[in-house]
Amino acid sequence: MLKRALISVFNKEGIVDFAKFLVNKGVEIISTGGTYKHLKENNIPVTEVNEVTGFDEILDGRVKTLHPAIHGGILAIRDNKEHMSIIENKGIKPIDMVVVNLYPFFEKVKEDLEFQEKIEFIDIGGPTMIRAAAKNFKDVVVLTDTKDYSDVMDQIEKNNEVNYDTRKRLAGKVFNLMASYDAAISNFLLEDTEYPENLALSYTKSMDLRYGENSHQSAACYTANNGKGIMNNIEILNGKQLSYNNIKDMDIAWKVVWEFDDIACCGLKHNTPCGVALGENVHDAYLKAYSCDPVSIFGGIVAFNRKVDKKTAEEMVKIFLEIVIAPDFDSDALEVLKTKKNLRVIKCNTKPEDNFNIAKVDGAILVQSEDKLFAEKMEVVTDKKPTEEELKELTFAMKVCKYTKSNAIVVSKGCVAVGIGGGQVNRIWAAEEALERGEGATVLASDAFFPFDDVVKTAAKHGIKAIIQPGGSIRDKDSIKACNENDISMVFTGIRHFKH
């Protein structure tokens, strides 16, 4: 039987109706600060917490409910005679329900506030109360989510009580919330610490997904509570719900186009680029990216690093695409794209922000810094030196190579990735794949060094004029010799770009 409830909420949504319901069921309401005033203004009988504690709030509201009269009433086990005798002797009444939602640290940490202003949104009293209530969930109902009000009211209406399973579930939500809340605070304070002793992640479920990589796998999307990253800053302008594979592919395509200051377009399928190009405008960039592999781009994702115009939109709707993502769309371009009702049109107003990459293995999580370093040096190791135009082309090809599964080879012509070979267990197969597709290519990029000179010799047969690779093989001299014999320039970067 519920007799007393403590209500202290930052988010006032639904609280007046909920409190009225409790009062009508004979429940005494205790409240604090702003919540007390809000309930009072809505003519709800309410007792201010200092009347219970006999102690006024202090330190600008930092200390309101941290008192034995509150926590004794929450933590006392009702069927423990000693507990009940102690609180009775101390004049403490049991508290049967705690309704609290926390200071909005998740939201405030994203805002452009001073450090100390953000600190003030770290809740202390609220977490202490809900943790106490959750520990004693058998005797105390704890609510932290406005979405749970209706279910609790239904149960009280029907049974005059809240059942054990619901109490347990609500208690579990408390510790789940607190783990994420504390992780967000920890990450904020340790933002300059690369690898803390304990890894605390703070993400909130933003959507349930239809399924995972395959239809028999369940999936959901959780977004970072710090507000950073692509998934926190997208606007879906058209199309159906994003899928698990859509999100993974979109992430890579977006990262590819933002490797470049020039106008860029990336076509991507199965987490691998199938066409990447720079262009004079978005239409030119799209046509060039499409030309790299007109077959594979079908059913894929297209990303741009500039606003999309109508002319480009009219080209894209000629084929089936899953997603088009760009910083913005002209209004007439959007009208054209919306003629494809299932095409997901995504506007994203932020560049990629990931600094770390996380991979899960059985029983562990692996964390590494993002592969953002391009080259320690651009060392020409051959007799022939690449031209300035070839250096630009080599840089382009290597940046595409970075996002291609290893072993990866990319061949390019005119800053168009005409041949992409990836995911091969040996480098020569990747080279053969890229070169066979990349007719007319003039430069070649490799994500790792050449263990033998076979790639150079094969490249020479296909008319390659310049090569970029990390270097570092014990047989580098063999590849250099083969380049010199075939009038090919080659540069070493000193940086490997494996992608597994």
Curated annotation (Swiss-Prot):
EC number: 2.1.2.3, 3.5.4.10
Entry's Gene Ontology cellular component terms: cytosol
Reaction catalyzed: (6R)-10-formyltetrahydrofolate + 5-amino-1-(5-phospho-beta-D-ribosyl)imidazole-4-carboxamide = 5-formamido-1-(5-phospho-D-ribosyl)imidazole-4-carboxamide + (6S)-5,6,7,8-tetrahydrofolate; IMP + H2O = 5-formamido-1-(5-phospho-D-ribosyl)imidazole-4-carboxamide
Pathway, per record: Purine metabolism; IMP biosynthesis via de novo pathway; 5-formamido-1-(5-phospho-D-ribosyl)imidazole-4-carboxamide from 5-amino-1-(5-phospho-D-ribosyl)imidazole-4-carboxamide (10-formyl THF route): step 1/1; Purine metabolism; IMP biosynthesis via de novo pathway; IMP from 5-formamido-1-(5-phospho-D-ribosyl)imidazole-4-carboxamide: step 1/1
InterPro entries assigned: AICAR_Tfase_dup_dom_sf, Cytidine_deaminase-like, MGS-like_dom, MGS-like_dom_sf, PurH-like
A Pfam family reported for this protein in Swiss-Prot or TrEMBL: MGS
Stretches assigned to the MGS-like domain: 1-144
Keywords: Hydrolase, Multifunctional enzyme, Purine biosynthesis, Transferase
Protein's GO biological process: 'de novo' IMP biosynthetic process
GO molecular function terms attached to this record: IMP cyclohydrolase activity; phosphoribosylaminoimidazolecarboxamide formyltransferase activity
Family classification: Belongs to the PurH family.
The record's note on its domains: The IMP cyclohydrolase activity resides in the N-terminal region.
Protein name per its UniProtKB record: Bifunctional purine biosynthesis protein PurH
Gene: purH
